[in-house]
Every structure is written in C-alpha cells, then in structure tokens.
UniProtKB/Swiss-Prot annotation:
Keywords: CBS domain, Glycoprotein, Membrane, Repeat, Transmembrane, Transmembrane helix. InterPro entries: ACDP, CBS_dom_sf, CNNM, Ion_transp-like_CBS. Residues 232-292, 297-352, 364-425 form the CBS domain. Signal peptide: none annotated. GO terms for biological process: magnesium ion homeostasis. Residues 1-43, 115-121, 181-494 are extracellular. It is a multi-pass membrane protein. Residues 459-494 are annotated as: Disordered. Pfam families: CNNM. This is DUF21 domain-containing protein At4g14240.
Length: 494
C-alpha cells in the first residue's frame, strides 16, 4: 500500500509541477545546496521509513509471554533488552498506531522531494526502488532476525515518537483496545502440551526434550483433570486384613508376599475399611503367638471422595500424615466439577486435618491400640461444612457415610504423574485395572528362592522350644501350604 501511495503521489505532484511551470522546464541544478538539501531529506525519509517498518514488524512480533520468559531465563544481555522493551510493547495498539503513522508520513513525503530533484519518470522509479529495498525488504529482514536487539537500541526513539504522536495515537489505540481487546498472553493447557511435544526429540524438529521429560510434563498438566477414582486400586483388587484375623504364619506369609508397606484393615466386610496397618510395626509380633490384628497399632486411614482431584490428594500426602487413603463414593455431586478446578490452592494453615487425635481406645496399661469397629473409623481431608481446597462441597459426614470403592496411595498419584506404571519386586500386575501381568513366574520364583523366605519356613518348621525342650513339628503339607501362600498371585495396592 505504501508503494502505491508513493507512486500515486509522485505522479500527482509531477503533474502539478509541470502545470505550474515550477519544475517542468528544468530541474534543480545538480550539486547545488538546494539539491543536496533535498537529496539529504529524501535519504533521511527512506531511512526513517525503513526503521519504522522494521520496528513495526520486530516489536509487534514480540509477545508479552516471550518477553517475560527472556527476562527470567535469558542471557544477561537478553534480560536487559527484554526489560527495556516490555513497557513499550504493553501498549500494543498505541505503539502500532504510532509506528504506522510515522511510516506513512515518511512514505508520503518522499515523492515530494524526489520530484524536485528528477523528472516524473525518474522520481517514480527511484521512489519505488528506495521504498521497496531500503524501506521495506531490508529493514524487515533484519528486524525479523534481530528484533529484540534492534528494538532495544531504538526504544528511546519509539518513546519520543509515542510522546509526539500521543494526541492521535492514544485515542485510536484506546478505541482499538475496546473494540478488539487485548491478546491472550498466556497459553492454555492444550497449547502448552503441544508446545512441549514440538520441542521433544521425537518430533524431529531439533528439540532437546527427551521422551521421559515430555511425558512427565504432559502428565503434570493432565493431573489437574484426573480424579481419585481414575488412579485408585479397586477395593476388589486390594489386599487387606480383617481386624479379627490372626497374625499367624499364613497371614505373615501373605503380607511378605505382597511386599506392601501399608495394609488396609477392615471389619467384617472388605468395604468397611476402618484403618491401616504399618507392616514395619509387625517386626515385634511373633507369628507363633497368633496375635490378633486388633491387638496391634492400627492407624487411621483418611477418606477422600472419588471426584477429588489428584493434586489435592498429593498435597495432603505431602503433609506426611498418611500416604494411603480410602476412596469413597459420595452420594450427590460437588458443586464445582473437577475439570474446572484449575486454580492453585493457597492454604492459610500449615497444619493438616489428618493430624487430629485418633479416636482410639486403650485397654489397661497396654501399648497396643484397638480401633473402635462399630463404624468405619476414617477421617476425611475436610472438616464439617468446609469446602475442599478446590471448592468441593462434600461434608465430612457425607464422606464418612460413603461406600469405599478403592484405595489410593502416593505411588498411584506418582504413576499418573509419570504416566507409567511403577513396578517393584513383588508386583504381579503392571496395571491392576487392565490386568496386565508382569513375569509372574519369575517374581514367584525369586520370592521362593529368597533367603528370608527359607529362614521363615525354617523357623516355622522348627517352631519354638518349650520349657521341657520339646520342639513343635510342622507337617510337610503345612510347609507346602506356606510356600504356596508366599508365591500366590500378587495384587498390589501401593
């Protein structure tokens, strides 16, 4: 458009000059002071128009997010340049009007002075050539490549021009702000995931991010939309102990085979989970005494609604009160759907609700703790009539009365974050939901060959000696049963 305006102006002005007889007969003498002045002004206008054209492309192509990134993670020189440009680029529409206005003035003034120096045909050719080469192509090519550096070096000129053009540029810029609005500076989650995938090595575009890095970043972005029900282990696939069962050799073998650090404890019905048992607390329990599960220390297991976001669960797990929770199906729905709960939670208190005193009974002077089993003795993450960190409206009573549908652990949350299953030495299934098996035979044989298993069988076979020196013998069938118990299929729940 600038080229067309320049050509049209040159033709019009040439025609006017010829009709008035000012420049139709003879041009300004070459080499005179007037000729040098007009030539200098023409060169200045071409140079000025080129700077305005280049700054228009260079500055307007720098987004606010890009400048923020450069200020935080760029080189010292880039940080300095981005900090100088950022206040100017914030006024995008006013900056655009200022640069275009100054560029148009320079372009329209160029034919006037060229017409004084040459005839109409030469003025048109020179105007088009200068404007195309030095006013458009070269400046925009340079500013496309070095927009940040050029913009930082000419930011003083831009500030002066914005001040001079303020009466015109400011009102027009405000109107554009109201009509068009501001550009959305931040990326959405889907855009961030696409940006990360583009920078991966697998994309083949020169990115440096490995597959694991892109997977973890994508998992972290998706974690806010996932709920406890998606990551939990179903209660049917969970290994748990009855509170009235005995910690005999068979029970100890099952616990050893599973390899869990925590085991849920239920009363009567496996869905009536009342607490959890730390396996390390069984170090002092002797299997031959057949101690009841209710006689050992049972910790409270917190309860979470099935639609609770995984980030909220992760935050509670990080407080250290528990790394296992029972997932319950609460009647009714929360007022705020999980997919819209994207704001970061800021908690004024550093204390977790899980650190409340346990509702336990102590019998006599014994240190063993017995849980009241009349009702599931769990505790939710939220207190009565309080919303969860992301605005959930579930009350503690509703969560307490909800049906337990699964168990979720810190490992389950990490697996969703990594988007890969974490398989340890005792796992039989890579994915419990899809029933994808690990090498079950190899896992079972490795457990059977373990020295700890042989010692456990030897201790059970020899038993404890009584006061008369008699030894309790264990039949061979019971030993086979014990070995089968240890090597039976494993169902992991943490």
């Amino acid at each position: 458009m600038h080229l067309i305006n320049a050509v049209a102006a040159a033709r019009i002005l040439s025609g006017i000059g010829q009709s008035n007889g000012n420049n139709g007969g003879e041009a300004i003498p070459f080499g005179s002071f007037e000729w040098i002045t007009y030539a200098g002004i023409s060169c200045f206008l071409v140079l000025f128009a080129g700077i305005m054209s280049g700054l228009t492309l260079g500055l307007m192509s720098l987004g606010l997010v890009e400048l923020e990134i450069l200020q935080r993670s760029g080189t010292p020189n880039e940080k300095k340049q981005a900090a100088a440009i950022f206040p100017v680029v914030q006024k995008q529409h006013q900056l655009l009007v200022t640069l275009l206005l100054c560029n148009a003035m320079a372009m329209e003034g160029l034919p006037i002075y060229l017409d004084k120096l040459f005839n109409e045909y030469v003025a048109i050719i020179l105007s088009v050539t200068f404007v195309l080469a030095f006013g458009e192509v070269i400046p925009q090519a340079i500013c496309t490549r070095y927009g940040l550096a050029v913009g930082a070096n000419f930011v003083w000129l831009v500030r002066i021009l914005m001040t001079l053009c303020y009466p015109i540029a400011f009102p027009i810029g405000k109107i554009l702000d109201l009509v068009l609005g501001h550009n959305d500076a931040l990326f959405r989650r889907a855009q961030l995931k696409a940006l990360v995938s583009i920078h991966s090595q697998e994309a083949g575009k020169g990115g440096e991010l490995t597959h694991d890095e892109t997977t973890i970043i994508s998992g972290a972005l998706d974690l806010t939309e996932k709920t406890a029900q998606e990551a939990m282990t179903p209660i049917e696939s969970t290994f748990s102990l009855d509170v009235n069962s005995k910690l005999d050799w068979e029970a100890m073998g099952k616990i050893l085979a599973r390899g869990h650090s925590r085991v849920p404890v239920y009363s009567g019905n496996p869905k009536n989970v009342i607490g959890l048992l730390l396996v390390k607390s069984l170090l002092t329990v002797r299997p031959e005494t057949e101690t009841l599960v209710s006689a050992v220390c049972i910790r409270r297991i917190p309860r979470v609604p099935a639609d609770m976001p995984l980030y909220d669960i992760l935050n509670e797990f990080q407080k250290g009160s528990s790394h296992m929770a029972a997932v319950v199906k609460v009647k009714g729905k929360s007022k705020v759907p999980p997919s819209t709960l994207l704001e970061e939670h800021t908690d004024e208190s550093n204390d977790s609700d899980l650190t409340a005193p346990l509702l336990l009974k102590r019998e006599g002077n014994h240190d063993n703790v017995i849980v009241t089993i009349d009702k599931a003795n769990g505790q939710s993450f939220f207190q009565n009539n309080e919303s969860g960190p992301h605005g959930f409206s579930h009350t503690s009573e509703a969560i307490e009365d909800g049906e337990v549908i699964g168990i979720i652990t810190l490992e389950d949350v990490f697996e969703e974050l990594l988007q890969e299953e974490i398989v340890d030495e005792t796992d039989e299934y890579v994915d419990v939901h899809k029933r994808i098996r690990v090498a079950a035979a190899a896992a079972a044989s490795s457990i059977a060959r373990a020295p700890s298993s042989r010692k456990l069988l030897a201790q059970k076979g020899t038993g404890g000696q009584n006061k008369q020196g008699q030894t309790n013998k264990v039949p061979g069938q019971e030993q086979d049963k014990m070995l089968g118990t240890i090597t039976e299929p494993i169902r992991r729940n943490n």
